[in-house]
Amino acid sequence: MCGIVGCILKEDNDVAPILFDCISKLEYRGYDSIGLATFADDNIHIKKDKGKIEEVDKKLDLSDMPGNFGIAHVRWATHGDPSKLNSHPHVDEDASIAVVHNGIIENYLEIKEKLTLEGHVFKSDTDTEVIPHLIQKFMDEKFDLEHAVRKTIDVIEGAYAIAAISKNEPDKIVATRKDSPLIVGIGEEGYYLASDSPAILKYARDIIYPERGEIVILDKDGVVVHDEFDNVVNKEIDTINWTPEMAEKEGYDHFMIKEINEQATAVRNTLTQKDNIQEIIDDIDDIQRICFVACGTSYHASLTGKYLIESLAGVPTDVILASEFKYSANTLNDKTLVIFISQSGETADSLKALDVANQTSKTLGIVNVAGSSITRRAQYVIQTQAGPEIGVAATKTYVAQLTSIYLFAALLSKNVELLKEIEKVPDFIDETLEDIEFIEDFSKRYNYARDFFYLGRGYSYPTALEGALKLKEITYIHGEGYAAGELKHGPLALIDEGIPVVVIIPPGDNYRKTMSNLEEVKSRGANVLAIGSADDESLKAKADDVIAINADVKEIIAPLVYIVPLQLIAYYITVEKGHDPDKPKNLAKCVTVE
């Protein structure tokens, strides 16, 4: 949700331009305000306000601040309205300590009440403000900054990533985390910390991943990590294989359209995980049940996985929303494989569920971000190879997740024919994208709509759900996905003249029944947009608009290809409406609070 960065330079150069550059690359996490704190001339300097990054920068000139070290923050309001007063960094009473924080302090009201009785005066409505006040309290008791932070995290409850600076201990940043992401970067010019790697890729690709409760100290000479017993921890340094350019638009108008166009590459790269997946399957040959746990788009990928695994391998498979997992946890056993799917690997609900599942079952993470919490806590990992995804609405990470699931299902069931079909998917995606101008033109005709319905059967049902989600996320148009066979059980009552209905109808076993459903909505006045085979003349005669997909795309792999035009429809309607598809209102890329 919120994003934090920190930097200390080896030389006495101004750090503010770097902090501003880094924090700007975390805006995809969702934000309503931005702030920076630096240290110079024996004082902490702070600039912050609510609003878009470019607007606040124009007003405050955020790059023009003295000092060679500092911290920065983009805030996504959870406690207190979006305002200058509630934006980070927050300080103690005499502004000797500044703190940025991502997460939620669950017991902040209790702490605030106690500190108020001790004479502390609070200025904001946030939970975060108790942190600098606690640090001040412990530093007044003669603890240094590191140990004051340690004492503070012994008091606070919840999920957090925290970075703090003190004017009484210059040239030092102290950070810690619990159940919120935090990485540390080692660069040629300095040392960095951030909520996510795209923020610091330009400056550091050698990364340290602090564990829960560890204290990280950054100074001009390097990085030191202490465990909860104050012992120095020798951390392994990983190198991120993403390049800074991967996190840039590279000439596209938006990240989302860039990432849609990168999907064939994402599939090709993820196919390289085949041998790793085979090793995992060889090691879990005694499983009797599979349970997917996911949220949002990853949940739809999981539903496709259920269809594949049950139909091909005959293994009973459940799909559970991560936020609802606790109600099913007592059904797990040592013959259950629990698969956690997450783009970020930091989704709070999934991490809570993973900790529970690890106690009884085998666990597997399918994750895009290397070194994320799920990759470190799951027993097995499949690394999708989509590269950094900046747009809030998932596109290329969805097809990369699907690719991993398809490989898993094909190898688990020893289905050689499916493996051959998966290899064709990148070319099918590239071919579909060749019709991008046609899709753009007719998508604009649908921006009048207040409601959309998406219909699919079998493997195409999760695709319908995902298409509807993409529409809702970025166009702000109400969209619902349904199993086409459920039309008569309620949704048909909502069909009126001119309502757009998207029908996903690849050739295969479900074709005839889906065509009957298409005719049902058409006869009631719906404006039918069908996605089907290029050689389907009957479909072209019955639908109002048809997006033609290569006839060689078989029904079983249709989810990997047919989703592409649905993403494009949502994108182009959004652009026509004048919205920013990369930063939809009220949404964040990485949901790190429950």
Predicted feature locations:
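Acidic/histidine-rich
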Residues: I156-G190, N447-E473, G508-N510, M515
